[in-house]
Curated annotation (Swiss-Prot):
The organism of origin for this protein: Arabidopsis thaliana
Gene coding for it: SMR8
One BP term from GO: regulation of DNA endoreduplication
InterPro entries: SMR (IPR040389)
Distribution of this protein across tissues and organs: Expressed in the root vascular tissue.
Keyword set includes NADP: no
Name of the protein: Cyclin-dependent protein kinase inhibitor SMR8
Length: 110
């Protein structure tokens, strides 16, 4: 709202005068006129071939098709465990010093 120096025919809105003689313009939001309905004359018809030409379609030629994917290979098989231990029986010799028993006897006496 405010005072405008434009001529009255260029103003959009409502013009009011205040008590001190100034003219004020209250700006309004211009509304659009409703749209007019479009009527086709009854002599104009659209044939099916023209209608099909206007709508996009998916290409169906063999050259544009996505190639078929071959089947996936089989999953890898689990490897056999390596033979870490041998099945050959080995005799183990134990070392037994003659004074080994005396060491344990002395500790037991404390």
């Amino acid at each position: 709202m405010g005072y405008s120096g434009k001529p009255h025919h260029q103003l959009d809105g409502e013009i009011r005068e205040s008590t001190d003689g100034k003219k004020w313009v209250i700006a309004g939001i211009p509304s659009r006129s409703p749209l007019k309905q479009i009527n086709l004359s009854p002599g104009v018809t659209v044939t099916e071939t023209e209608e099909q030409d206007q709508c996009p379609t998916t290409p169906t030629a063999v050259s544009v098709r996505i190639p078929r994917v071959p089947p996936c290979p089989a999953a890898p098989k689990k490897r056999k465990p390596s033979l870490k231990c041998s099945y050959v029986t080995v005799t183990r010799d134990y070392f037994s010093p003659p004074d080994l028993e005396t060491v344990f006897i002395q500790r037991a006496s404390y």
